[in-house]
Amino acid sequence: MKWFKYGDGMDLFADMRQEAAGEKERVVMHSQEPWCVLLVDDDEQMHQITRLALTGFKFQNRPLELISVLSGLEARKVMAERSDIALALVDVVMETEHAGLDLVRYIREELQNRQVRLVLRTGQAGQAPEDRVIKEYEIDDYKEKTELTTQKLRTLLYSMLRAYRDLCLIEDQKLGLSHVIEASANVQNTKSLQSYATAVLNQLTSLLKLHASAFYCVATPCPDSEKCNALTVATTAERVELYVESPFKGLPEDVQRRCKEVLSQRTTRDYGDAYVFFKQDERGVDSVLYVGFEQELSELDRKLLEIYMYNIGLTFENINLMVDLRETSKELVYNLANAVEARSRETGAHVQRVALYCERLAHLYGLAESEADMIKNASPLHDVGKVAIPDSILHKPGKLDAQEWAIMQKHVEYGVEILNRSKRRLMQVAKEIAATHHEKWDGSGYPNRLQGDDIPISGRITAIADVFDALGAKRSYKDPWTDEQIREELMAQKGRHFEPKLVELLLEHWDEFIAIRASLPD
């Protein structure tokens, strides 16, 4: 069975294309970055002795970068400019008797740097008693220069660098956890699943101490079995386009080949410098998690990554189900609205246009995305009550008489009655719109003669959107108005029928609304 047929989709690693082939080399280089150690002492001989004692020193296969300064003032400049100082060996007495102590206070309190390890070295212990200094200053050790032999100095560095490494890891995990929490609080659709899945993947690789390039994608087989729809939903690499089709395009050839092998063979593979996990859920949706690394994964590491795949896959499935249900409800709303419009001998394009006008006006008005989306999806039902109005009135070509007009106004009441049977948020907003979109800003509307801000914003927005579209459309009782006539009418009804701000927004963005109308002709 042939599984893959890739088109000319967007490059997944567009900005990283030239670097991608050298992924392993970049990882090795990353592991060789030196540990930055700041030497602060006004005695140049101490710098020379320290450098000699630390010749050839390495921790976790990373060398040292020794930065020498001769005063507390110089040290302040270095600490303010660099955030990668792992350890500072600080003399207590320099340009002043307490210059070293002042530097410690500056680093901890003004710079708020809690990660750098600080060790005081003094040749005059009486100037700064150890007990008082340890108690009052946030330092990690206190040494007399005479006691720091070569071996003890190297032992000190192992201890301090190990502590710095662990603090950095904890900080990374805290940041990663905050991303996970932030993302998980908003996992409501497949787009927000990206941030959630990526945050968890970053957190996981951090916990496992992997200098890894990882990405996670799902592949859905198409009915014709000739290709698959694959989407990348998580990655640890920067500048990567997420959630695009043809996710393997732009990746190094060996990575593409491995992912395709795993998907076609439906099995997890260990490639030595990369591990590619495979999973298939109950719906036949395949998932691939690619993790490139420099060290071998332990059995626990693999288990954690497999758990990640399972849970993200389950979340993805649940989110897709939720999205499917939401889209189904939208379709039902539009189908019902189209049926009402068809009975009124108006096209279904009217409710679609009104919905888009409402969404754009809501955004321009400054409403939240969720509120704008709700108004957009509820507005098609603004005239649902017309199903209860006799055809003789709905289709009358001329002007309605007083009795007919009173009956026509009843469609608001009928619409509220129909929509009130559901307690769902969408239906409640639709009820609000049906009840108020014929109210007017000056209080002369119907059915309740509401005025100004007493009219819900959903009703105010739908009112102007409905009239704007109706004026430009051919109806049984009128020909379409010209754009100039519509503009003049909106200006005339500013502060009377419509909220002034909404009129101004529509006129300021006139071309956008005309473009919407043109995109959905009757």
Curated annotation (Swiss-Prot):
pH dependence: Optimum pH is 9.0-11.0.
Cofactor note: Requires a divalent metal cation for activity. Likely has a bi-nuclear metal center. Has the highest enzyme activity with Mn(2+).
Active site (record annotation): 386
Enzyme Commission code(s) on record: 3.1.4.-
One GO MF term: cyclic-nucleotide phosphodiesterase activity
Residues recorded with modification 4-aspartylphosphate: 91
Cofactor(s) for this UniProt protein: Mn(2+)
Binding-site list for a divalent metal cation 1: 382-383, 466
Knocked-out gene: effects: Significant increase in the ability to colonize the small intestine compared to the wild-type strain. No defect in biofilm formation. Enforced DncV expression in mutant cells lacking this gene causes an enhanced inhibition of chemotaxis. The double mutant lacking both VC_A0681 and VC_A0210 shows enhanced bacterial infectivity, and the triple one (VC_A0681, VC_A0210 and VC_A0931) has the highest infectivity, which demonstrates that V-cGAPs play non-redundant roles in cGAMP degradation.
Binding site for a divalent metal cation 2: 383, 411, 437-438
Catalyzed reactions: 3',3'-cGAMP + H2O = 5'-pApG-3' + H(+)
Subunit structure, as described in the record: Homodimer.
Database matches in PANTHER family: 3'3'-CGAMP-SPECIFIC PHOSPHODIESTERASE 2 (PTHR45228:SF9), CYCLIC DI-GMP PHOSPHODIESTERASE TM_0186-RELATED (PTHR45228)
Record-given protein name: 3'3'-cGAMP-specific phosphodiesterase 2
Protein source organism: Vibrio cholerae serotype O1 (strain ATCC 39315 / El Tor Inaba N16961)
Taxonomic lineage from the root: Bacteria, Pseudomonadati, Pseudomonadota, Gammaproteobacteria, Vibrionales
